[in-house]
Swiss-Prot record:
The keyword Secreted applies. The gene is icaB. GO terms for biological process: carbohydrate metabolic process. Residues 1-30 form the signal peptide. Gene3D superfamilies: Glycoside hydrolase/deacetylase. This is Poly-beta-1,6-N-acetyl-D-glucosamine N-deacetylase. Catalyzes the N-deacetylation of poly-beta-1,6-N-acetyl-D-glucosamine (PNAG, also referred to as PIA), a biofilm adhesin polysaccharide. In fact, the IcaB deacetylase converts 15 to 20% of the GlcNAc residues of PNAG to glucosamine. N-deacetylation is crucial for attachment of the polysaccharide to the bacterial cell surface; it leads to the introduction of positive charges in the otherwise neutral PIA polymer, allowing electrostatic interactions. It is an enzyme of class 3 (hydrolase). PROSITE patterns: NODB. Its EC number is 3.5.1.-. SUPFAM superfamilies: Glycoside hydrolase/deacetylase. Disruption phenotype: Deletion of icaB leads to shedding of the PIA polymer from the cell surface to the culture filtrate, and an inability to support biofilm formation. Deacetylated PIA is not observed in the mutant strains. Furthermore, these strains are unable to form biofilms, show significantly higher sensitivity to the effects of antibacterial peptides, their adhesion to epithelial cells is significantly lower than that of the wild-type, their phagocytosis by human neutrophils is highly increased, and their persistence is significantly impaired in a murine model of device-related infection. It is found in: Secreted, Cell wall. Keywords: Cell wall, Hydrolase, Secreted, Signal, Virulence.
Length: 289
């Protein structure tokens, strides 16, 4: 009886924490039912992940009990992630670095079945469960870092990766790191994004600090920013342009075409449901080689 009580209490505690201050559940994509992904011949998929959690009975129980969007829409299990990568490889996906993704976009022509893998926040689950899979298959990826919180052990209930762990990933040559703001990834009262609600002056200072950190520590930086919660407005785009940021990424269920606005480049938030109903059904994987 005692082990069951311990599991139940632990589940309730995690459930409360998960629903209390979720880091990533405001964007419109998470609130819509999955639809068929529109296909255009000259396009690429930007696949975004947040958590790659270990599959175990407790996590499954919490997911079932809570119906939490943080778990359902922002997480895949390690088994699901590995299966998704294997499926993409089996269907001849051309995995791109961010540098290659930008190069093809600017040239106006993506290779067939182009896929760019990227992660927001970079918490411990990415190091534990995604990094080994990508390393095994030699697949490049981009991590968007909240640069003032590298190594934070309780950032909105997340354990973010340490610099030592990020350095290890970077040194493989498979990873590049970009900005997810320096210290503006949070929600204010009324579920307002701290980044969007900040003044241009505050946003500019934050961007400069984040870029300074990245240029100093991970100089393959492409001067890109993934928006907290996938949300952006024209005012913040002005601040980005003033401070040399050339590319900005949202969260939308759309493939990327060369003519996409460089400050509103869509990324598909990957859950297992989204992968099954959107990615596997995308007509781009049926193109002749």
């Amino acid at each position: 009886m005692k082990p069951f009580k311990l599991i139940f209490i632990s589940a309730l505690m995690i459930l409360i924490m998960t629903n209390a201050t979720p880091i990533s559940h405001l964007n419109a994509q998470a609130n819509e039912e999955n639809k068929k992904l529109k296909y255009e011949k000259n396009s690429a998929l930007a696949l975004n992940y947040h958590r790659v959690r270990k599959k175990d009975p407790l996590n499954d129980f919490i997911s079932l009990l809570s119906g939490s969007k943080e778990i359902k829409n922002y997480s895949v299990t390690d088994q699901e992630f590995k299966s998704q990568i294997q499926w993409l490889k089996a269907h001849d996906a051309k995995f791109l670095t961010l540098k290659e993704f930008i190069k093809y976009k600017e040239k106006g022509k993506f290779p067939k079945r182009s896929v760019w893998i990227n992660f927001d926040d970079m918490d411990q689950t990415i190091y534990d469960n995604a990094f080994p899979v990508l390393k095994k298959y030699h697949i490049p990826a981009t991590g968007f870092l909240i640069t003032n919180h590298i190594g934070s052990t309780n950032f909105h209930n997340l354990n973010l990766l340490s610099k030592k762990q990020l350095d290890e990933m970077y040194e493989t040559g498979l990873w590049d790191f970009e900005s997810h703001t320096h210290d503006l990834h949070a929600l204010k009262k009324g579920n307002k994004s701290k980044f969007l609600d900040s003044s241009q002056s505050v946003a500019s200072k934050d961007i400069k600090k984040s870029e300074h950190y990245l240029n100093k520590n991970y100089p393959k930086n492409e001067r890109a920013l993934a928006y907290p919660y996938g949300l952006i407005n024209d005012d913040k785009i002005k601040a980005m342009k003033k401070n040399g940021i050339q590319y900005g990424f949202t969260l939308q269920e759309k493939a990327v075409t060369p003519d996409a606005d460089n400050y509103r480049i869509p990324r598909i938030l990957v859950s297992n449901d989204a992968f099954e109903t959107l990615i596997k059904e995308w007509d781009g994987f049926d193109e002749e080689k």
